[in-house]
Amino acid sequence: MTDPTAPAAPDVEQVRRDARAALDAVAAATRALDDAALAGPSALPGWSRSHVLAHVTAIGEAMARQAERAAHGELVEVYDGGAAGREAGIQAGARRSVAEHVGALESLGERLDAAWPGPGSSAWDAPVTYRDGTVVDALVAWWREVRIHAVDLDAGLGLDTWPRALGLHLLDFLGVRLADDVAVELVGEPTALRVGPGGLRLAAEPGVSPRTETPVGSDPGFDARDGVVVRGRLTDVAAWLAGRRPDAEPDAFRDGVRTPLPGIGPWPSPYSPPR
């Protein structure tokens, strides 16, 4: 059953092109680093810029592998060796030099270009292990990761590099991080949009979430008088929900009175099926 309040999914070819543009931007930013900057702190606590680059390469290779094996009707783990393999790969990759990182990113771009199906191909619907989804889900995950971590690199790529389509996708994907008594109202958008645990939806009326329109009939909807409403611009709210520092912190209100921003839940698991 299609939810009439859910905005359209991002266009696959648009996502593929923008993910490639983001990877190229990361590679260009990496070329400008010296050894000290590479070893310096990123925007992610405990990770150097080299760790971020290692992760970008690792997640890109993981999603390329999902697509490559799906083309042969095979399902494989997201990371070879699971979570332990992921961590070991990041730590090993963090020892690369600037030139080695650039080479790895360039090779990754070529691999991804070859791995993704052609425009309109039915291969986009092939199943993958990632979130029990399809090759489209693997592509969107890569797009999400490379755009977010491009900013985490803290090397000149800011939130202004996030296209509007990414911001909308992040709100839909990360809405599950919100508690049931929290909803988000976006300001400055041509269409009234709201975000709640059910994801991104077209707003029904001020103060009421349209989650009653979702297929889950037990969802009672959200009344702003009973919970917290977070208001902010698209990119700022998306950054906050992604656990990143927004350019302008969103505002939170309970019963019309300003209140601290609510806590958010964990990042959706790569093993959780898509909604």
Segments (PLM) and residue ranges:
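Short, helix-capping/interhelical loops that line the mouth of catalytic, cofactor-
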Residues: M1-Q14, A62-R111
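Generic structural signal for individual residues within well-ordered alpha-helical segments
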Residues: S50-L53, V102, A238
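Active-site-proximal cofactor/substrate-binding loop regions of enzyme domains
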Residues: Q14-D18, A28, A36-R65
